[in-house]
Every structure is written in structure tokens, then in C-alpha cells.
Amino acid sequence: MKKRSPKRSPKKTRKASKPASSLTSRHLALKRTVVRPSATKGELKYLHWGEVELETLNPLLQRQLIVGLNVMLTRVLLKKGCIVPLHSHVNEQLSYILEGALKFWIDGREIVVHAGEVLTIPPNMPHKAEALEDTIDLDIFNPPRADWINKTDSYLRK
């Protein structure tokens, strides 16, 4: 006599989860507000760029700042042809290009940084940049840039 195997329920198939979508300008949509987020000891912040003040420095340059205790994240919007004049600062800088491209003059070299690429700039290293096309740049500074926070960065406001 043949042994019967127990009835098994059909295998349940899991739905494949959707891959995380890439960051697009839709995610970075701007809304004008008056919030200037800054951290104080032990404060947790959860923000959308649309909640962060958009500051216009000149007709070709705008930025948003999120300031932490030891680091600052900035979203910089540059129109094609915008020049960031030669300058240096005591802050270490990481520049991540979300959209567009920036040409940097730094350490005796010209470096073009495209969307998806990162440039690290050590403290006190003079540098200049030009937007080769409309560009969205995320800059991280350690420590936070006091001249940007208190708006004494006249080299950008021309």
C-alpha cells in the first residue's frame, strides 16, 4: 500500500518589493517658508527641503541651510554661468552634485564634478567654482560655516 504524503498548501510567493526610487527634483521641490533649522544639544530634527528657508544671494545663486551641532548641510542652487569666487575657509567641505555640473579651480587644477560625483575639499584650501549648467549641489561643512549662518559671506552676494 502506497503511503500518502501530507497535503501541503501551495507555496506563497512574496511580492517583490519595489526598488528605492532615485532622488529626483520632485523630491527636492521648493516651497517658500521662513524656517531656519538649527540644532541645539540633544534636539532631533526631521525636515523636508520645502520647510527650509530659501535664501537668494544673487540672481544666479540660492541656498538652504540645515545646521547641526558640528556639521552643516546646505542645498545650493546655481544657474548656468554662476561663478563662486575664489575663497577659502577653515571648514572641511564635501560637495555632492545632485543635478548639473560644477567646474572647480582648486590646488592648481581644474576639476569638473558631474551629477552623482563628490568632491572633498580640505580646510583652508582656496577654491573657485562655475556652474556649467543649472546645478543642484549638496555641500556638507564641518564645522558649520559661521559666515553663511550670520550672512557675512559678501563674496557670494555680488
Q: Predicted segments — roles?
A:
Residues L98-E99, H114-A115, E133:
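A cytosolic small-molecule/anion-sensing beta-strand core signal
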Residues M1-N70, D153-K158:
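A short, N-terminal "cap"/entry segment at the start of jelly-roll beta-barrel domains
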Residues L77-K79, H89-F104:
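Short, conserved beta-strand element in jelly-roll/cupin
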Residues L94, A101-K103, E110, P126, ...:
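Structural motif
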Residues P123-D147:
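Ligand-binding loop in jelly-roll beta-barrel domains
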